[in-house]
Regions:
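Cleavable N-terminal export/targeting peptides
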Residues: 1-22
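Predominantly the C-terminal beta-signal and adjacent terminal strand-loop region
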Residues: 76-80, 87, 149-192
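Gram-negative (and chloroplast) outer-membrane scaffold detector with strong preference
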Residues: 21-22, 56-125, 135, 146, ...
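Short, conserved structural micro-motifs that define repeat-unit consensus positions
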Residues: 26-28, 56-60, 141-147, 153-155
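Outer-membrane beta-barrel and related beta-rich outer-membrane complex signature
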Residues: 37-39, 81-83, 123-125, 167-170
Length: 192
């Protein structure tokens, strides 16, 4: 009997959960603009700006508070004094907690803060050069969702993500490399 009542209660809750529209999925185009820092300083070391597609999912815990998981990957060229040292990919999944101001009007601004875990792969640098394969760092964001349909939104977003790794030559550490990009995004979101 208890199992039957539980099953009926769960089934009855499904329409409420669906109507609540607790999820949002966005697809964005990102411009990743590294803010390169080295320590000790390596003059002229740079990481290229790149565009990439991104998908993210936001779960709304309350109408004002959401948790967003950002998924994107990018291939960057690393240069020294304008000369190519090679290329590397990084995958920085980022989880942020967001506060959405005025969650009911057409224009819905938000701010967020969180963490990222970055893994480097397909590292193809000059002979002997390597980078660490992982990095943990913080993330800040601000953005706005602009309603264009009942559940569809144009999204503008900016993030600052802290990504650090070590550059090594033959196993000897040369410098700490902070890629630390500012990430500009524009896209479309659907709330469901």
């Amino acid at each position: 009997m208890k199992k039957t009542l539980l099953a009926v209660a769960l089934i009855a809750a499904i329409p409420t959960a669906v109507q609540a529209e607790n999820w949002m999925m966005r697809v964005r185009a990102l411009d990743i603009v590294p803010d390169v820092k080295t320590s000790p300083t390596v003059a002229g070391l740079d990481v290229s700006d790149e565009w990439t597609p991104e998908v993210d999912f936001t779960y709304f815990i309350t109408p004002n508070i959401g948790m967003e998981l950002i998924l994107a990957t990018q291939r960057h060229e690393v240069t020294l004094g304008g000369a190519s040292l090679g290329k590397l990919n990084h995958l920085p999944p980022t989880l942020t907690v967001q506060y959405h101001f005025n969650p009911t009007p057409t224009i819905k601004p938000y701010i967020g803060a969180g963490l990222n875990y970055t893994t480097f792969y397909n590292v193809d640098l000059a002979p002997g050069l390597t980078v660490d394969k992982h990095s943990f760092g913080g993330a800040l964001q601000a953005g706005v969702d602009i309603a264009v349909t009942q559940n569809g939104y144009i999204n503008l977003d900016v993030k600052k993500i802290w990504i650090e790794t070590e550059v090594r030559n033959g196993g000897v550490k040369l410098t700490d490399l902070g890629i630390n990009p500012i990430v500009w995004g524009i896209g479309y979101g659907f709330r469901f």
